[in-house]
């Protein structure tokens, strides 16, 4: 993966003449709007000082519960690019584009080329069925929580910025290569830290971690709620408690930004501990935000799985 990404980004740096030309206003920096935190962080790292990068979602909003406002539409009025995670999580995208007066806006889907997974039958144990995010896409959209997939998303962003502004193509490729190396280092840290740990049963607040679990050998038992803002019914809750007891799950992961009351109630009934994982859906930050918050998640996993269940 490392050699492939390095070769790809190096090739992008020297092949600017092959890029399609676009008509951006050269009197101002490229103006980029991103959907939410992971995409904002990737784009800031790649753009550097060569573009203005603005996040659409405010610091307290997440993509699941985002409510479109006139000020959000206004943010896109002058933008050259709108970079999204894709995979269906921005299900308000069509409405946003429809209301925007910016007919020259280029939408960049950073999930291009990523294979989506269906949540397995046992994952949405609160509902007793597979959790289908945004059924038009037919897959789980939380791809950014896998650092290897994040490398693919970053490469897609590099290519989009080079196409939009060929004059800075080499700078975008150089920044992209440096960022790819940081993502590769993050992946290596996850592998080295998690591989030797026992008891890697993961029950999360909502169904955000199938990609991370598959990448690093975690047993993704299930999710508490179908969406972060939707609690299970009493019948679903009883089924969930039975499942946790049956599998002897020792740790339940609350979600940063949401009250852990429901998980604490389940933990009291089952004897499990409560820890916390960050989906990175809520908040704002700089070019290092993705790396920093993913490392905090790694520390949480290390502490939780290091316990004897």
Give short role names for the model-derived ranges:
Residues 1-20:
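Gram-negative bacterial Sec-dependent N-terminal signal peptides
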Residues 20-309:
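Extracytoplasmic metal-acquisition and chelation regions
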């Amino acid at each position: 993966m490392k050699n492939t990404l390095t070769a790809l980004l190096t090739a992008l740096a020297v092949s600017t003449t092959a890029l399609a030309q676009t008509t951006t206003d050269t009197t101002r920096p490229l103006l980029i709007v991103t959907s939410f935190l992971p995409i904002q962080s990737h784009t800031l790292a790649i753009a550097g000082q060569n573009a203005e990068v603005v996040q659409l979602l405010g610091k307290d909003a997440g993509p699941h519960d985002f409510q479109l406002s006139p000020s959000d539409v206004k943010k896109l009025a002058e933008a050259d690019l709108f970079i999204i995670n894709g995979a269906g999580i921005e299900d308000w995208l069509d409405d946003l584009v429809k209301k925007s007066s910016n007919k020259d806006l280029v939408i960049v889907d950073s999930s291009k080329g990523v294979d989506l997974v269906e949540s397995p039958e046992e994952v949405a144990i609160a509902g007793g069925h597979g959790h289908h995010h945004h059924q038009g896409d037919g897959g789980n959209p939380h791809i950014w929580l896998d650092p290897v997939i994040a490398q693919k998303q970053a490469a897609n962003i590099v290519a989009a910025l080079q196409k939009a502004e060929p004059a800075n193509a080499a700078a975008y490729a150089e920044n992209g290569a440096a960022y790819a190396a940081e993502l590769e280092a993050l992946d290596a840290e996850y592998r080295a830290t998690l591989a030797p740990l026992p008891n890697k049963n993961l029950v999360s607040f909502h169904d955000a971690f199938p990609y991370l679990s598959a990448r690093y050998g975690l047993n993704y038992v299930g999710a508490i709620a179908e969406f972060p803002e939707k609690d299970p019914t009493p019948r679903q809750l009883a089924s969930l408690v039975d499942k946790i007891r049956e599998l002897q799950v020792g740790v339940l992961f609350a979600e940063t930004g949401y009250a852990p009351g429901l998980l604490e109630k389940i933990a009291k009934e089952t004897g499990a501990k409560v820890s916390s994982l960050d989906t990175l859906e809520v908040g704002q930050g700089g070019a290092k935000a993705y790396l920093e918050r993913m490392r905090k998640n790694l520390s949480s996993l290390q502490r939780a799985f290091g316990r004897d269940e």
